[in-house]
Swiss-Prot record:
Keywords: Antibiotic resistance, Cell inner membrane, Cell membrane, Cell shape, Cell wall biogenesis/degradation, Hydrolase, Membrane, Peptidoglycan synthesis, Transmembrane, Transmembrane helix. It holds the Pfam family BacA. It comes from the Bacteria. The chain crosses the membrane at residues 1-21, 39-59, 83-103, 111-131, 144-164, 189-209, 218-238, 246-266. Bacitracin is thought to be involved in the inhibition of peptidoglycan synthesis by sequestering undecaprenyl diphosphate, thereby reducing the pool of lipid carrier available. It catalyses: di-trans,octa-cis-undecaprenyl diphosphate + H2O = di-trans,octa-cis-undecaprenyl phosphate + phosphate + H(+). Its EC number is 3.6.1.27. It is a multi-pass membrane protein. The keyword Nucleus does not apply. This is Undecaprenyl-diphosphatase. It is an enzyme of class 3 (hydrolase). It is found in: Cell inner membrane.
Amino acid sequence: MSYFEAFILALIQGLTEFLPISSSAHLILPSAILGWEDQGLAFDVAVHVGTLMAVVIYFRQEVITLFQALFASIFKGDRSKEAKLAWMIVIATIPACVFGLLMKDIIEVYLRSAYVIATTTIIFGLLLWWVDRNAELVADEYQTGWKKALFIGIAQALAMIPGTSRSGATITAALYLGFTREAAARFSFLMSIPIITLAGGYLGMKLVTSGEPVHIGFLLTGIVTSFISAYICIHFFLKMISRMGMTPFVIYRLILGFGLFAFLLMA
């Protein structure tokens, strides 16, 4: 892997991690079209660190408040809306953890293909369009109960299927439940913190036990590039989502999905 490849892959990861357009659909393109080799475990860990830093720093006030409220609820019986939201994020994280442990090998062997990614990119894009068109858009993230949190968590678990998009699935589920677009995005981004942490930790443990060589320059390129691109992406997505809706992302997903199919059929 060259520094140029490291920069492009980290840029793709940072820009697509928090948009409802599927990072896996984009990360398959360089290898499918340009023949780039797999970037390796160390680089995967690096871009996870970069995107995690971006969302934690962007939502730093909310993260601190939610952590304080969570511990206050455990040790002091705090029942504030912040404590409730913190617990809803915990509940929403559980399905992905269970699904990941049970289905990880099946997904890796049978579902990580370009045809699956193209199909899910299209199907979940159409689902996002339908939900956004018919949603009530009235609730905020603090109105989340355990049933809603579990429903969104199941959507996050299904997003482990390549091409689905974690943010796309969770935002779609939240919109279906009546969240405003901005609230759906905020809840999705806050939900990403524990799941990216767990995924990065798992990859980190695999890296340690694999003995794979680590190139510090590539790692720093991955961390810095994914951090900057993800931070900018979060900022502008939240600023623009209420007025532009999900249609631009739906159109983009359809173009990407059908374009990937066309490439595969011609290859």
